[in-house]
Regions:
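C-terminal functional module detector
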Residues: 2, 6-13, 17-228
C-alpha cells in the first residue's frame, strides 16, 4: 500500500469482515467514513470512501484514530503549498475501553513519530509532530500493538502537494512494480507456470500488463528527476 502511495496513486483504505471465510465475528473489521451533513446516505458514504475520508479498524467500534494536519485537514484532504514548508500533524486515539498500545505517524512510508501508552474512555492518547515537505508526499496514522507489530487502526492519507508536482516519493518503489509486472509477463508466456490460467486471449492480457508497466516506467523516470 505504501509503495503505491509513493508512486502517486491516491488510494482509499476500506475493509470489512470476510464472514464466513473468516472466523472473527461480523463487524470486527470495519471502515469509518466521514460523511458531510447530518443525514447519512449510501451515496455520501460511497463518495466518502472514494475521496479517502476513511479509517479502518480491526477492533470493531472499540477504538478510533482522529488524524488532523494543520488542525483541520483529515484523511483524503489535499494540502497545497507553493514551496518547501512545514505542516503540523496531530492524531488522537480514543477508545471505548482501556487499551494499551502505540500510535504512529507515517510519511512517505516511514514512521516519523510514535507515542506508546494507554488510552482510556474520555482520556485519549495524543501525538503531535511537525514534518517538512520539500517535495510532494503523504501522511497517515496508525495504531499498533505495544510491540509495534500488529495494526489495529489505519487512516487513509492526507496528501501534501508542493508546487503542483506529483507524488514521486520513491524511485525504488516504482521500479519494484516494473520488476513485478516483468515477472508476471514471464510467467504467463506459453510454457510458463501461470499460462494455464489464461485460456482466452493471452495477447489482450499481455497488452494490459504492458500498459501498466509503461505507466510505472514513466513514474520511475519522473521520480529520478524529482528526487535527484
Amino acid at each position: 500500500y505504501y509503495r503505491l502511495l509513493n508512486c502517486g496513486f491516491r488510494l482509499s483504505l476500506a475493509g470489512g469482515t470476510d464472514y464466513p471465510c473468516n472466523r472473527v465475528p461480523l463487524g470486527s473489521v470495519l471502515t469509518y467514513v466521514e460523511v458531510p451533513g447530518k443525514k447519512i446516505t449510501y451515496q455520501k458514504w460511497i463518495d466518502g470512501i472514494a475521496e479517502g475520508r476513511t479509517v479502518v479498524s480491526r477492533n470493531a467500534h472499540n477504538e478510533f484514530l482522529n488524524l488532523k494536519v494543520n488542525k483541520t485537514a483529515g484523511p483524503g484532504t489535499i494540502i497545497r503549498i507553493k514551496k518547501e514548508g512545514k505542516v503540523n500533524i496531530g492524531v488522537s486515539w480514543s477508545v471505548s475501553k482501556e487499551i494499551s498500545g502505540q500510535i504512529e505517524l507515517v510519511s512517505n512510508g516511514r514512521v516519523i513519530a510514535r507515542q506508546k501508552g494507554v488510552a482510556r474512555p474520555g482520556n485519549p492518547l495524543v501525538l503531535h509532530a511537525t514534518q517538512t515537505f520539500s517535495r510532494s508526499g503523504w501522511i497517515c496514522s496508525r495504531r499498533m500493538d505495544s510491540l509495534g507489530r500488529i495494526h489495529f487502526l489505519h487512516s487513509s492519507p492526507v496528501y501534501v502537494i508542493v508546487d503542483d508536482q506529483p507524488i514521486r516519493a520513491s524511485t525504488e518503489d516504482a521500479e519494484y512494480f516494473v520488476t513485478w509486472i516483468d515477472n508476471i509477463l514471464k510467467q504467463i508466456e506459453p510454457g510458463g507456470p501461470w499460462n494455464k490460467y489464461f485460456p482466452g486471449d493471452l495477447e489482450t492480457v499481455k497488452a494490459h500488463y504492458r500498459k501498466a508497466r509503461d505507466i510505472y516506467k514513466t513514474i520511475v523516470a519522473e521520480s529520478r528527476v524529482i528526487n535527484k
